[in-house]
From Swiss-Prot:
It is found in: Cytoplasm; Cell projection, Cilium. It comes from Danio rerio (Zebrafish). This is Protein broad-minded. Its main location: cytoplasm. PANTHER family: PROTEIN BROAD-MINDED, UPF0183 PROTEIN. InterPro entries: BROMI_C (IPR055392), BROMI_M (IPR032735), BROMI_N (IPR055391), PHAF1/BROMI (IPR039156), Rab-GAP_TBC_sf (IPR035969). Disruption phenotype: Fish are viable during embryogenesis and early larval stages, but exhibit curvature of the body axis and hydrocephalus, and curled cilia in distal kidney tubules. Interacts with cdk20, which promotes cdk20 stability and function. The keyword Cytoplasm applies. Keywords: Cell projection, Cilium, Cytoplasm, Developmental protein. It comes from the Eukaryota. The gene is tbc1d32. Residues 1171-1283 form the Rab-GAP TBC domain. GO terms for cellular component: cilium; cytoplasm.
């Protein structure tokens, strides 16, 4: 088959034609002939079907028949000479045979024959193609006269690309001829044929030819030709060119289409006047159809050009933008004349009709690259566009009352419009005015988003004496929203995206989401007054002028809620008292909103009360009361009770729905029942958000709905739903807040929340992912707590942070300690985790874990964090004997040498156990004890710290206490106290004492320790308790009789607390060896005294009082003198500071309102911690934000610090100064103390927020470097700003009758 016959050539021609048809799309997409050649040359590499083409199969058979014998001979010769080719020799064989074959005579003869034959085949194909092309052009000329001249959507859309048609490559000489034929002086038929040829040519060839400049000029002339066929053809060519040309060319084409002078002449020549009265414009009218096509092509280009113009010089973009703006600025002086005079139809009206929502402008303003050019040109040359847009909005606002009946109809028709023969063709003047208003509103809404855009304001417009400011514009928009007509029943389901209300709300939402925009545009008194005007009118008993009451009020509430989510907006609503209430008082917006909401819930307003509208206004209140400062303002209104009452009413309605009976009419329609359930959930959701703050959680608990609210939160949490549309974070903070209290943790347990967290942890820790195959095993964890378990670990830390949580979940619960554990048995409770992961005291527990070391390390890490809370540790130690278990674990973890004692095995578990043993045994602040690190060191001795296997601890972990020397300053305090004893103390003595105290604290605070400090504290308490004005609690009769209290017994928890206190006191050299009985006696007296002032708790939530750390602190402060300690505590119990410094003082106390006494929520949490969060947000916002992001709350760590009197967090001198400061300066200093400590830790807090271990850091690490004296001046500043609020609220803990 070395020669081709005539039949072979015909077959080759057919196969080649098929191949070219198969790759037609690839070739036609090539921008040049060279690129098309490259595509064909690399077809085998890029086309997976290459070897399936018949042409390729034919050539393969031809090569095999021509060279098969040669290849066999060469292969045989090579294998005889070299042996058999295997392995790496295979490549050598192939290369050698290929080389010899290509040098053979047969190969050269085959290639020559193939080339000659293919040249003849290709030439035949080209000739046949030219004949077919001539026939096609003739057919096109015949068909063209039969086509409709108004195929706008088909002919003008740039989606009808030239790449979708068949065309041949064209030579430059042919393009020169086409350019000459398009000369305006040529006959119409000649120009038509030239345009036909041009449309079939590749745009890349046309644009790269030398005659393009003249050709473009002739095309621009043809575009304005009266003959619609010619202009349509030019538009068709331009549309194809746009999609395949670089910007430097398309900008010229765009300039040709949007030629300002040409279009202006066109508008004036055809006298395109704006329709008036009953007249309308017809989109099918030839001149109008041409304009619409031209404008639409321009608009399509405007919307697409933003995707690529940044890759080109800025001057190209400037030309396009300036051409557009100059076109749209045509006729501006006639365009905004008075409505009664005749107006001209302008390009802005047509662009509004084609792009109603100004998508082109939004895209141009999106990127900084183009936005700067647009704003610069608008400011310098085309500000009239902005003025006209503003004027149109004002005109619509002034006339929207008259248009109200027609607006809905226009919206409905315009939303579903489709320009063309199949759609609408007639547009009235009102419709054109409306689309121009929508377009203008969208342009202005986008303009004011940006700083330089807002600089255009104020703007002077006609018929307004004063320029229109930004505030004026927003007020106008809100009033437009108010006047939008109420939709009829049949249209409520329509998503009327072009309704003025929705358009205005879109602008307002955008402004709310941008801080700078909101400050300049929304956070203004006139705007707030406009938003609240309907509320004030309704509260006065009148009806506001609103076309759709429910819609307008719901949108108002939505805007107010968005304003309330920001700090600046919330402050404006809470504190700016520029509004006049229904009673004529000047009040803030927050008071007005909550009054209106209460009236809505009570159904006392003249308005159709729908659940959606009520829910919207409750949501506004919620954005305020879920912050500490907002709750402070709204608390007097008892909104939580109003919402709870509405929830109870709704809940009873849904419960009363009877079981459906066949044949009986339903009591409630399914839709109505759904709305009742939705309203019930909405009320629960809003009630739940009271739990965002400590005081709010107390209010929620008092409603009796905390269990239902937590259950609802759990249902949303499991679905991973947001807290609200305005909330950036999930339910983490709220869960942590709830878990801090006894009723909260009980609600979390009963809802299933705790079980879900435990199961998730167990799945991540022990089960792994079920969908991972064995071929992709899980990586070996490098960290003690793997990243997959970190989230569950932090959730458990948050959950068990409070001793109340540990008590409710583990108190009086024995470990299962089974003899055998099923491998499939999952942990479902905290008790199970304690049994399976922490207290591993049998082989059965070890064998039940798939990842024993990793899981046990996790458990020990959790135990370490739990033991940081001394009360939690006492409970766990008293129930489970943790210390003995850990010591035994250390003793078991040694080698077994043939003789002598074994050595400790240093592994992850022994290091973790060692850390916990030191932590729970050594008591002290940052400079009083040393904790061993958890990480090993490099070198020969990776763990140089002593291992603990028996108590007492090695001295390595305990620092020596410095001796306290008497100094001049101490003598000064002593002299002051001595002089006070000798003279009668008057009312000014306390002021003198405070000044003297502050002076010593500022100069030499480290001398304010020892006996002098005890004397100072004792005298201050004596002085305050002797004054009826300073006594807060009524006097209580208590006879100190040692024999009667000695019969009382201390619980195991209290006994362990005594041991820790004695250990710390002896370490500080404050107590004698025989002080145990004295401390026990003091605690028994305190219990006896306080038990006489406690109510009988009917609730199961008695709370977990733990050890009395304040009494132990006083005992150490008085150097173990039980008489002085008891005397001071009894006098101190009458003072207000005792309520907050001495936690057992108000535990279930008769002095509290009965509902608070039975709630098990202590004032330290609901008052002190609440104000810590409030002040932290105002004074140290970065720290507050860090807590929010971590899911932890400042109240949790503060309750822990205060509950154990800063033991293990501060050194003993700082603890003494903390107590003395709060007694002398006032109980509100407890709040300032916590804020100061968190401010001191700011850098550490921010760093550990990044590493996602903030909770662990705050609980495990002491407050390094903190000195009360260094922050006393800062605390005095906080006192000046906040004392009136904080101290008054602390005083309000007693019932008003007291």
């Amino acid at each position: 088959m070395s020669q081709f016959s005539t039949e072979d050539e015909a077959e080759l021609q057919t196969l080649l034609r098929k191949l070219l048809k198969s790759v037609k799309d690839r070739i036609s997409g090539a921008p040049s002939v060279e690129c098309a050649e490259e595509i064909l040359l690399h077809l085998e590499e890029t086309d997976k079907n290459f070897h399936n083409y018949e042409f390729v199969k034919y050539l393969r058979e031809y090569v095999e028949s021509s060279l098969g014998a040669v290849i066999e001979v060469e292969t045989e010769n090579f294998t005889k000479g070299e042996g058999h080719a295997v392995g790496s020799g295979q490549d050598t064989l192939v290369h050698a045979v290929t080389k010899n074959t290509r040098e053979s005579t047969q190969y050269k003869q085959m290639m020559q024959t193939l080339k000659q034959t293919m040249m003849m085949v290709v030439e035949s194909l080209i000739n046949k193609f030219e004949e077919d092309q001539m026939k096609r052009e003739e057919m096109d000329r015949k068909i063209q006269h039969q086509q409709s001249i108004s195929q706008y959507a088909d002919n003008c859309s740039d989606s009808d690309s030239s790449f979708n048609q068949s065309y041949a490559f064209i030579k430059h000489e042919q393009l020169q001829v086409i350019a000459e034929k398009l000369d305006p002086g040529r006959p119409r038929e000649v120009r038509w044929e030239a345009l036909q040829s041009l449309c079939h040519a590749p745009p890349s060839d046309v644009l790269s030819c030398e005659s393009w400049t003249g050709l473009r000029r002739n095309l621009s002339t043809a575009l304005t030709d009266p003959d619609p066929e010619l202009s349509d053809k030019v538009l068709q060519f331009f549309a194809k060119t746009f999609s395949s040309s670089p910007l430097n060319v398309t900008k010229d084409i765009y300039a040709s289409i949007g030629n300002t002078k040409t279009l202006e002449a066109h508008f004036l020549y055809h006298k395109l006047s704006f329709p008036s009265g009953t007249t309308s414009i017809d989109a099918n009218r030839p001149d109008m159809a041409r304009l619409l096509k031209q404008m639409r092509l321009m608009n399509d280009f405007q919307k697409e050009v933003t995707t690529f113009w940044i890759r080109h010089p800025e001057k190209y973009m400037e030309e396009i933008i300036e051409n557009t703006l100059s076109l749209l600025a045509l006729h501006s002086e006639q365009g905004m004349s008075s409505p009664g005079s005749e107006k001209s139809l302008e390009p802005i009206h047509l662009i509004s009709l084609l792009d109603i929502k100004a998508t082109w402008f939004k895209k141009w303003m999106h990127g900084y690259y183009s936005r700067t050019v647009v704003l610069r040109l608008l400011e310098r040359k085309y500000k009239s566009l902005i003025v006209n847009a503003l004027q149109q909005c004002i005109y619509y606002f002034d006339s929207c009352d008259a248009l109200s009946e027609e607006t809905l109809e226009m919206i409905h028709s315009l939303e579903h419009q489709q320009i063309g023969p199949a759609g609408r063709t007639l547009y009235t003047s009102k419709e054109l005015e409306f689309v121009y208003f929508v377009h203008s509103l969208c342009v202005l809404g986008r303009l004011v988003m940006y700083t330089n855009g807002r600089k255009f304001f104020p703007i002077k417009v006609k018929k307004r004496r004063d320029p229109v400011t930004l505030t004026d514009l927003v007020v106008i928009l809100i009033n437009i929203m108010y006047q939008h007509p109420k939709p009829s029943c049949g249209e409520t389901a329509l998503a009327d995206t072009m309704s003025p209300t929705n358009l205005v709300m879109e602008v307002l939402r955008t402004l709310c989401d941008r801080t700078e925009c909101a400050v300049e545009c929304l956070y203004q008194i006139p705007v707030i007054e406009t938003l609240l005007a309907p509320l004030i009118t309704l509260l006065t008993g009148k009806l506001p002028k609103l076309n759709s009451m429910e819609s307008a009020l719901t949108h108002t509430a939505d805007t107010l809620a968005r304003i309330a989510t920001t700090e600046r907006g919330l402050s404006l609503l809470l504190y700016d008292r520029n509004l006049v209430s229904a009673e004529g008082e000047s009040i803030s917006a927050a008071h007005l909103i909550v009054q209106f909401t209460q009236k809505l819930l009570a159904k006392e307003l003249q308005v159709e009360n729908s659940s959606s509208m009520s829910g919207a206004f409750i949501f506004v209140c919620r954005q305020m009361y879920n912050t500490c400062e907002g709750l402070q303002v709204l608390r007097p209104y008892s909104l939580h009770e109003c919402i709870a009452q509405a929830w109870r009413t709704t809940s009873s309605m849904s419960e009363r729905v009877p079981t459906p009976v066949p044949g009986a009419p339903p009591a409630l329609a399914s839709q109505e029942l759904q709305s009742v359930v939705a309203w019930e959930e909405m009320l629960l959701d809003n009630l739940l958000n009271f739990a965002a703050t400590p005081k709010g959680l107390l209010l929620l608990q008092q409603t009796g709905a905390i269990n239902e609210c937590v259950t609802y939160m759990f249902s949303r949490f499991t679905k991973k739903l947001q807290v609200s549309r305005c909330e950036k974070f999930g339910y983490g903070v709220m869960v942590t807040q709830v878990a801090t209290t006894a009723p909260g943790i009980v609600a979390l347990q009963s809802s299933g929340f705790v079980q879900t967290i435990v199961v998730e942890l167990w799945s991540a820790l022990e089960c792994g992912r079920e969908d991972v195959r064995v071929v992709h095993p899980k990586s070996t964890p490098m960290d003690p707590i793997d990243r997959s378990c970190l989230k569950s670990f932090l959730s458990l830390v948050n959950l068990l942070s409070s001793p109340h949580a540990v008590w409710e979940l583990l108190g009086h619960r024995a470990l299962p300690n089974k003899t055998e554990y099923n491998l499939r048995e999952m942990a479902t409770s905290v008790l199970d985790l304690m049994d399976r992961l922490i207290i591993i005291n049998s082989d059965a527990k070890i064998h039940s874990l798939f990842n024993y070391e990793q899981s046990h390390t996790f458990g020990l890490r959790l135990l370490s964090v739990l033991c940081c809370n001394l009360d939690s540790f006492l409970l766990l130690e008293s129930q489970y004997k943790l210390t003995d278990l850990l010591l035994q674990g250390q003793r078991d973890n040694v080698t077994e040498p043939p003789s002598g004692e074994g050595e400790f095995i240093i592994d992850g578990l022994s290091v973790e156990r060692n850390h916990i043993l030191v932590r729970i045994c050594a008591v002290g602040g940052p400079s009083e004890r040393k904790l061993p690190p958890r990480a090993l060191q490099k070198g020969n001795d990776p763990y140089p710290w002593p291992m603990v296997s028996t108590y007492p601890l090695p001295k390595y972990y305990i620092f020596d206490v410095p001796k306290i020397l008497r100094t001049k300053q101490e003598s000064e305090i002593g002299a002051f106290l001595t002089s006070s004893k000798e003279t009668e103390r008057d009312a000014s003595w306390m002021d003198d004492c405070r000044r003297q105290f502050c002076k010593i604290m500022a100069t030499k605070s480290n001398t304010l320790t020892g006996y002098v400090l005890a004397d100072l504290l004792e005298m201050v308490v004596l002085h305050l308790s002797s004054s009826s004005n300073d006594c807060f609690f009524p006097p209580a009769e208590y006879k100190v009789v040692d024999n009667s209290v000695k019969t009382r017994s201390l619980s195991s928890v209290e006994q362990l607390g005594v041991e820790i206190s004695l250990r710390y006191g002896k370490f500080l050299k404050l107590l004698r060896e025989d002080s145990e009985q004295d401390l026990c006696l003091l605690l028994k007296h305190c219990q006896e005294f306080l038990s006489q002032q406690r109510v009988k708790v009917t609730s199961e939530l008695c709370g977990y009082p733990g050890h009395d750390w304040f009494a132990s602190t006083v005992f150490l402060l008085m150097h173990g003198d039980v008489g002085r300690s008891l005397s001071l505590l009894l006098r101190f119990s009458r003072l207000l500071p005792s309520a907050f410094l001495w936690p057992p003082r108000l535990h279930s106390s008769v002095h509290l309102p009965i509902e608070i006494a039975q709630s098990a929520i202590h004032p330290i949490y609901s008052c002190t911690a609440h104000y810590v969060e409030m002040l932290l947000k105002a004074e140290v916002p970065l720290v507050f934000s860090a807590f929010r992001m971590s899911g932890f709350t400042p109240s949790q760590i503060c309750v822990q610090w205060l509950g154990q009197c800063f033991w293990n967090y501060l050194d003993w001198p700082e603890i003494c100064q903390y107590v003395t400061t709060c007694v002398i300066m006032g109980p509100d200093y407890q709040v300032y103390m916590c804020v100061s400590a968190l401010r001191h830790l700011q850098q550490d807090i921010l760093q550990h927020t990044q590493t996602q271990d903030l909770q662990v850091f705050l609980k495990e690490e002491p407050i390094q470097g903190f000195r009360v004296s260094n922050y006393l001046e800062y605390m005095e500043g906080l006192e000046r700003s906040y004392r009136s609020m904080v101290l008054s609220d602390m005083r309000s803990i007693l019932p008003r009758s007291s």
